[in-house]
Amino acid sequence: MISDINALKYKKVLLKVSGEALMGDKQFGHEYDVIKKIAIDIKEVIDLGVEVAIVVGGGNIYRGINAALVGMDRASADYIGMLATVINALTLQNVMESLNIYTRVLSAIPMMSVCEPYIRRKAKRHMEKKRVVIFAGGTGNPFCTTDSAAVLRAIEMNCDILLKATQVDGVYDSDPKKNPDAKKYFTISYKDVITNNLQVMDTAAIAVARENKLPIRVFSIKEQGNFARVIQDKGEYTTIEA
């Protein structure tokens, strides 16, 4: 453990966790053992003295874009997807609080009975008080992904880096699950991610990150302790930057 926060390169970070990461090997919903492991990883980073914010996806419950493909109005489908992210945020909060991690859920869609509405200054104040802020509801707008929400919230919170937790250990030139010869990038530019149409994040999210010089690090959430390792420039990952 690093006792001196000044020894760390990244002191304020945003972690993007996909909905799929929360369901483990299930086809739908939550795998609580997996969520607890993620919460333990987050606690390890907090114990280093790092301020942590989180954006959760909702794909383990509902995917708006898939519903739109079968005829549902896209805006309506996206709003349902935003509600799914609130379910995930509250689930993650509950597991984290069982480990004595102070958290607050802030939703871009106001739901006063279950969580706080997203207010930038309030979110920053929570982080200053060493609370983990979990952002739910995406951006609050349809036609925007939770990756875009993660980039926006990271910039608004003045985070040093965005860490995207995925099912693979970085960015590849093709799907490593389908192509055993897929090439892994250790560093790659925003421009190359967009030009090569790499599916690590949607183009809008990458473009906003590039414009605001927000570095993105992609790593695997599957291996216990990876979050803390990646924060300290250890382990396997890909960095996306200028």
From Swiss-Prot:
Pathway: Pyrimidine metabolism; CTP biosynthesis via de novo pathway; UDP from UMP (UMPK route): step 1/1. It is found in: Cytoplasm. Inhibited by UTP. It catalyses: UMP + ATP = UDP + ADP. It comes from the Bacteria. ATP binds at K16, V17, S18, G19, G59, R63, T166, Q167, Y172, D175. Homohexamer. HAMAP family: PyrH_B (MF_01220_B). This is Uridylate kinase. It comes from Rickettsia conorii (strain ATCC VR-613 / Malish 7). The gene is pyrH.
